[in-house]
Structures are given as C-alpha cells and as structure tokens.
Regions:
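Cleavable N-terminal export/targeting peptides
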Residues: 1-34, 254
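Transmembrane beta-barrel domains of Gram-negative outer membranes and organellar outer membranes
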Residues: 26-254
Length: 254
C-alpha cells in the first residue's frame, strides 16, 4: 500500500493513539472546535460556537458559548478575537476568557498530499487571572470526497503559579480530529474526536470524547457563505464527561 493511499487512515490513527497514551490537565470545553489550515485572504468571519456537557453534574457540567470575529489579513495569515461565555450548574454565566487566535498556512492548498498550518493562541482568563500561550500544527488531507483534519496543541500557563495550583502542571497537550465525507454541500456526515492531554513529562491516558458529526454550507451570493457543523460526543474514559453536544455557525463574507 502506498503512503498516498494510506494517508486518509494514518492521521486519525495517530490522533487516537495519542489519546490513549497522554494525560489531561485541563479538559476540552464543550464549545471547542477543529481548525483548518486553509485561509481565504481578505475574508471576514463571524462565528457562534456552543456546547453543553453533563449539565446535571455539578462537578464537570458546563454550558458554554464562544463569539468570534476574524479577518484574513494576508494570503497565509488569518487572525481572530474570541470571547468565551460559560456557565456551570448553580452559577451565573460570565465572560471567562478572551483569546487572540492566529492561523498561518504553510502549504499551498492542494499542491501536496497534506496541507499544513500553524495555530497560535494567546488568552487571558479573567476569572482565574491567568494568561496562556498555545501553539501547534494543523493538518488537512483530502482524497476524493474524504477529508481529514487533525489539530495538535501545546498550551502553557504564562502567569505565575497561584495559591491552590500546587501539583498542577503549567503545560498541557490536546488534540482534535475529524473525518467527513463530502456527500453534498448542505450535508456531509462525519466523525469528531477531542482529547485534552496532559503534561508531556507524565504520560497517562485520561480524557477522550468521540462521536458522530455533520457538516454543511450554504452559498448566500455576493461572496457570502454560511457554514455549520454539530456533533454528539460520548466520553470514552472515566474522567471525560459522559455526553457533549456541540455546534458551530460561521458567516463569511468579503
């Protein structure tokens, strides 16, 4: 079997293997999403992301929304500002985190068997008074109607360790992977998986959630598009929420 033919299977297998050997520090939120390394120059984007997980569980239940505004600054650079608005059982919803995210496209779309990019994020958690830096590669592989995306992210706490943080690592790894079948523009079935991984110095399996997803897009004319996706994810480890329902709406225009 050639490497080109095997590649649609290789990426998700690598991601799942990572989820089985790595440890979690901070769980992936219900409104998290998967990023593509492909950039549309001079395109504006407005996004609404949301999700709910185990809301009846006071320890790990959460309802969260993310509001995002972005622009394709250069042919290979897209930048956006994101605000996260979560709520846990028994608590009021509050703006928790403000994020500045950047996507850098490293390869020309379709010229190689694998499209590659770099994702970077600087964030401030205003409730915990902590700052974070995150960076990692993004991969996209297309064969026929099949498309696979893989994100791997290293995140580090920049602010000083606070009281109560003793024993917690300042570094964490996470990944997200999806497969979709481009059946038709309005509906594309697929699968998504998210894992929050842990300190690379102490590798142990902890969180992994996986489930069916669907994707779609509608052309609105005059360079305007509406994209959407949603997934129902089941927890595969004891530390993962039992069920997560997530969605993403994206309005694009030039």
């Amino acid at each position: 079997m050639s490497f080109r033919i095997a590649s649609p299977i290789l990426l998700p297998l690598v991601a799942m293997s990572m989820g089985m050997i790595l440890n979690n520090v901070v769980q992936a939120g219900p409104a998290d999403n998967i990023y593509s390394p492909i950039i549309d120059y001079r395109e504006w984007e407005f996004e609404l992301k949301g999700g709910i997980q185990d809301f009846g569980n006071r320890n790990r239940g959460e309802l969260a929304y993310k509001f995002t505004f972005g622009y394709g600054i250069a042919p290979r650079w897209f930048s956006e500002i994101e605000v996260e608005y979560p709520r846990s059982p028994g608590n009021a919803a509050r703006v928790e985190e403000i994020e500045w995210e950047n996507i850098f496209q490293l390869t020309e779309h379709g010229e190689h068997w694998l499209d590659v990019g770099i994702f970077n994020e600087i964030s401030h958690n205003r409730l915990q008074h902590k700052n974070f830096f995150a960076i990692g590669p993004m991969f996209q592989q297309e064969t026929g109607r099949s498309q696979i995306n893989l994100n791997i992210l290293w995140k580090r706490q920049l602010s000083a360790v606070q009281e109560g943080d003793a024993g917690n690592s300042r570094n964490a790894l996470s990944y997200a992977v999806q497969w979709k079948w481009n059946l038709r523009p309005a509906f594309q079935p697929g699968v998504q998986a998210f894992g929050s991984l842990g300190d690379p110095a102490h590798l142990r399996s902890q969180e992994l959630k996986l489930g069916p997803a669907f994707f779609g897009a509608a052309r609105l004319g005059n360079g305007r598009n509406l994209k959407y996706n949603a997934a129902l994810l089941g927890g595969l480890t004891r530390e993962t929420p039992n069920a997560t329902l997530r969605f993403q709406l994206e309005y694009e225009f030039f």
